[in-house]
Amino acid sequence: MNGAVCVLSALIAVFTCFSCRPAVQDERAVRIAVFVPGFRHDSPVYAMLCDGVERAVTQERATGRSIGLDIIEAGPNQALWREKLAHLAAEQRYRLIVSSNPALPHVLEPILRQFPLQRFLVLDAYAPQEHSLITFRYNQWEQAYLAGHLSALVSASAMRFANADKKIGLIAGQSYPVMTQTIIPAFLAGARAVDPAFEVDVRVVGNWYDAAKSADLARILFHEGVDVMMPICGGANQGVLAAARELGFYVSWFDDNGYARAPGYVVGSSVMEQERLAYEQTLRCIRGELPSAGAWTLGVKDGYVRFIEEDPLYLQTVPEPIRVRQSALLRRIQSGELTLPVR
């Protein structure tokens, strides 16, 4: 860690004389960097981020615009993120650096001060006080509440793998504020809206890639009576899916459409429209319409948090009475009849 700090300090010293003036750019030429704090294909969130930015760039290139795009996969070692972001900012080549992770506003704090003219867009994060930083967060209380509600409906049903225990599970990659303060309590609240007796058993992998460990944790939960589990552990999600097929339990998927990942086992997909948001905000950047700073929260009523209920695999796997109750909850949130916390 001390080495990373020294490297960052050296970078800042070298580029101090350049940090207060913008890079020279052709008015029509745009260059964008996507900073992936992990690996693109290990995480639905990062895959959607890259897909959305690429779609916007491809669309605008078709009109004759000169647009450069660099996608940098930084890996899961958070200790290196600040150093790598400082390198990008110091290059003074990018109109916008785009990323996605709740921890990034904190990581960016010294870089924003040193390079105030470099604009950053971070999705799935919230930082209302920072200059030159634009953040959008999804209302993950709504997202996790929907997932918990569906999980409890399935657990309390007569479906093949359901049991009599009032217990559902969540396997997280790591423990972090959004997980402990929003996702877990909202997941539990959604379940208890079905039956106040429900409990949530939470296990933590310790990283975002160890599928063998997540599978072991899923086996432990299964043998303790958990019949529906929600994995939020990046590439390690695959271990939970493998255990579900091996043992016979259900999976509630988070972030993107997961029904096809394990047909017959994935019973719900509570998603955030990350690809759409990345596409829209990248277009705004290219067209010169993106503000210099700001923080926004988007939820069900905005159309950026959804529960996917039209997928044929959902219709085939989940009985109609459960689908009707889940749909009724979704409509109550959409209409404003049910107001959930904004977090």
Curated annotation (Swiss-Prot):
Location of the protein in the cell: Cell inner membrane
Highest taxon in the source lineage: Bacteria
Pfam families, per database record: Bmp
GO cellular component: plasma membrane
Keyword Nucleotide-binding appears in the UniProt entry: no
InterPro entries cross-referenced by the UniProt entry: BMP_lipoprotein, Peripla_BP_I, PnrA-like
Main localization, broad class: membrane
UniProt signal peptide: 1-19
UniProtKB keywords: Cell inner membrane, Cell membrane, Lipoprotein, Membrane, Palmitate, Signal, Transport
Lipidated positions per record (N-palmitoyl cysteine): 20
Gene3D superfamilies per UniProt: 3.40.50.2300
Chain segments annotated as transmembrane: none
Membrane topology classification: Lipid-anchor
Sites where the protein binds riboflavin: 43-46, 124, 140, 176, 208, 255
Residues with lipid group (S-diacylglycerol cysteine): 20
Self-association state and partner proteins as the record states: Monomer in solution. The complex is probably composed of two ATP-binding proteins (RfuB), two transmembrane proteins (RfuC and RfuD) and a solute-binding protein (RfuA).
Task of the protein: Probably part of the ABC transporter complex RfuABCD involved in riboflavin import. Binds riboflavin.
Family of the protein in this entry: Belongs to the BMP lipoprotein family.
Protein name (Swiss-Prot/TrEMBL): ABC transporter riboflavin-binding protein RfuA
Species of the source: Treponema pallidum (strain Nichols)
Gene name of the encoded protein: rfuA
